[in-house]
Amino acid sequence: DINLIPEECKDKASTLVVYTPAVPQEHAELTYFRENGFDIHKRSQVLGIITRSSKGLCVAGTHGKTTTSTMAAHLLHQSHVGCIAFLGGISKNYGTNLLLSATSPYTVIEADEFDRSFHWLSPWMSVITATDPDHLDIYGTKEAYLESFRHYTTLIQPGGALILHKGLEMQADVQPGVATYTYSRNEGDFHAENIRIGNGEIFIDFVAPDTRINDIQLGVPVSINIENGVAAMALAHLSGATDEEIKQGMASFRGVDRRFDFKLKNDRIVFLSDYAHHPAEIAQSVKSVRELYQDKKITVIFQPHLYTRTRD
């Protein structure tokens, strides 16, 4: 309904219209802006413009990018480094998916591969968490999906870095001057050691090529957050956050809405909401629950989110 458009947004000189692929081209309000000559950009195009005017810290991958990018944003935001952040979920620390800074050169962005949106970005540094095929309604084949990630690595700017999950099937193709690191839970340039899980808590030691941070407590004690945390800490470390800032930030991280989100927790019942749609993600979620609650019965309610995604 174009009558819902605020009057101040009908001034072409001062209005930038930003939309996502979820908005149909025939949507009435989008049609109004297009037919009246407004400046219109996809969200991914705007994020691309932002990464060309700041140092983009981007997190891409089939799984884990929302939690990892939100965690990295929290680590930097509460450190002396600071950051701007455009996230794919609502941070429970801040109650928003947008963080601002007047002084930091860094912008944390969740790099979405849907519709090849991440090809608009110019990352300074990027994590790639996983490349299990997804969005096959867009890509068609596994090979095309992997190729899109290879092309994405060519966009990382010289002087920056690629932090690649160890063992991925894809081939990176970075420009000269881009440092390449690996990470995982247990091995790689960045990894965790001395992992302690028990009594609803997780402690780890973080190992980097040039430092080690001992006795880090995970603010959201879920086993998958060990790996997510290693990637987030790697980004924060390479961006200049101190060891103590990283340690404090990991302990104070409160998670993301709908990402292993505890809705009810008492002695009798634990109710979790988790946005896991890919088979690998669902398996990891169940594994994480089982590790935390070894003696409880697990009941799963699965909501198919998209027909094409569930079919593929």
Locations of regions flagged by a protein language model:
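Short internal beta-strands
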Residues: 162-166, 299-302
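Nucleotide phosphate-binding/pyrophosphate-handling subdomain across enzymes
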Residues: 198-200, 209-312
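Beta-strand->loop->alpha-helix junctions that form or flank phosphate-binding loops
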Residues: 41-45, 86-88, 177-198, 217-223, ...
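A short, compositionally biased
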Residues: 166, 196-203
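A short, well-structured beta->alpha microelement
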Residues: 1-5
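Phosphate-binding loop of NTP-binding sites
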Residues: 6-12, 21-164, 170-179, 230, ...
